[in-house]
C-alpha cells in the first residue's frame, strides 16, 4: 500500500515537472507558430522636414503580411507594401515575397532571410527606382530583427522588438 502511494507521488511529480517544462519551453512556441498561417498589418506615418527626402514624397506606408512558419525551420512571407505620397492620393504598391530560416531560442524568434523577390507588376510614378530600392532595403533590414515571442491566445501572438516596438500577428483560421 505504501509503495503504491510512493509510485503515485513520483508519477504526479513527474507529470508536474513535464508539464512545467513543456509550457515553459520553446517547444510550445514552435507548436503555436507552425500551427497556422499568420497575418499582420502595419501603418507607418512619415514626417520629414526636407522638401525631397531620399525616399521621395513618402508620407505613409501600409504593410499587410501573411507568413507561414514551417516545421522544418523555414518560413514564407508575402507582403503588400502600399506607399502613399504627400498628397495621399497616388498609391504605389510593392509586392514582396520572402523566404528564409527561423529558430526559437529563449522565447526569441530569430529570423534569417535567405531570399527576397519583388513580385510587383507595376511601377510607381511618384517614386524613382532608386527610392523604391531604398524602401525595399529598409523592409529587408526590418525582417532581420530578432523578436521576443509571447502567446496572447491560440490565434494571437505578440512580437516585441528591441528597437521597433511591437507587432501583433493574428490568425483567422
UniProtKB/Swiss-Prot annotation:
It is a single-pass membrane protein. Residues 1-5 are cytoplasmic. One of its GO terms (cellular component) is plasma membrane. Keywords: Cell membrane, Membrane, Transmembrane, Transmembrane helix. InterPro entries: ToxS (IPR035288). Residues 26-173 are periplasmic. The keyword Membrane applies. Its main location: membrane. It holds the Pfam family ToxS. It is found in: Cell membrane. The chain crosses the membrane at residues 6-25. Interacts with ToxR and stimulates its activity. Interacts with the C-terminal periplasmic domain of ToxR, possibly by binding and stabilizing spontaneously forming ToxR dimers. This is Transmembrane regulatory protein ToxS. The gene is toxS.
Amino acid at each position: 500500500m505504501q509503495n503504491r502511494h510512493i509510485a503515485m507521488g513520483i508519477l504526479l511529480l513527474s507529470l508536474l515537472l513535464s508539464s512545467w517544462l513543456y509550457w515553459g519551453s520553446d517547444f510550445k512556441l514552435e507548436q503555436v507558430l507552425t500551427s497556422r498561417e499568420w497575418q499582420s498589418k502595419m501603418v507607418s506615418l512619415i514626417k520629414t522636414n526636407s522638401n525631397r527626402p531620399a525616399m521621395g514624397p513618402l508620407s505613409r506606408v501600409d504593410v499587410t503580411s501573411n507568413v507561414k512558419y514551417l516545421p522544418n525551420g523555414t518560413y514564407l512571407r508575402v507582403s503588400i507594401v502600399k506607399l502613399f505620397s504627400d498628397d495621399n492620393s497616388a498609391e504605389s504598391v510593392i509586392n514582396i515575397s520572402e523566404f528564409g530560416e527561423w529558430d526559437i531560442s529563449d522565447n526569441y524568434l530569430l529570423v534569417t532571410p535567405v531570399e527576397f523577390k519583388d513580385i510587383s507588376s507595376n511601377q510607381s510614378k511618384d517614386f524613382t527606382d532608386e527610392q523604391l530600392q531604398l524602401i525595399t532595403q529598409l523592409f529587408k533590414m526590418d525582417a532581420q530583427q530578432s523578436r521576443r515571442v509571447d502567446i496572447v491566445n491560440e490565434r494571437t501572438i505578440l512580437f516585441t522588438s528591441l528597437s521597433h516596438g511591437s507587432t501583433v500577428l493574428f490568425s483567422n483560421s
